[in-house]
Amino acid sequence: MRLWTVHPRYLDPRGLVAAWREALLAQKVLKGATTGYRHHPQLARFQAQDDPVAVIATFLVGIAEEAQHRGYRFDTTKISPQRFRARLPETNEQLLYEWGHLMAKLRARAPQFHRQFHGIMTPEPHPLFRIVSGKVREWERT
C-alpha cells in the first residue's frame, strides 16, 4: 500500500488506478470494516488525525479529481461523505523521498511519464497536504 504525498498528476495510468484502489482499501481499514492492514505504516498519518475517515476521504477526492481530469470514470460514490477542511502537514523530505521512489517506478514501467517529469526537482504535493520542513517520516520504510 502506498498513499502518495506527491500530486496524483505524476502517476501513470497504472499508478493512478493502484492509488485509487489502495486508498479505498485504506478507507475501509480506517472505518474498521476489515481486519487486515490495520497496522500498515502508510496509515499512520491518517490514524493520527481526529477524524481519519474524513482525511482519507479527502485524499480520495484528490485522486478522483485527477482521474476525472484524464477522462477516467472512478466511482466516487465509494468515497465517504466526510471531508477534512484543513491541509495536513507533511515534510519536504518525505515528499522528496516518495518522489525518488515514484521516479524509479516510472523509469521501469512508464518511461514516457519518467521523461515528462524527471527534470522536476520538487514536485507538487497531493492537494490534501501542505509541505513543512522536516525529515522522512518514521513510518516510512526506507
Residue ranges of predicted features:
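Sequence termini and other peripheral, non-core segments
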Residues: 1-16, 22-25, 29-33, 43, ...
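Conserved, mostly hydrophobic/aromatic
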Residues: 40
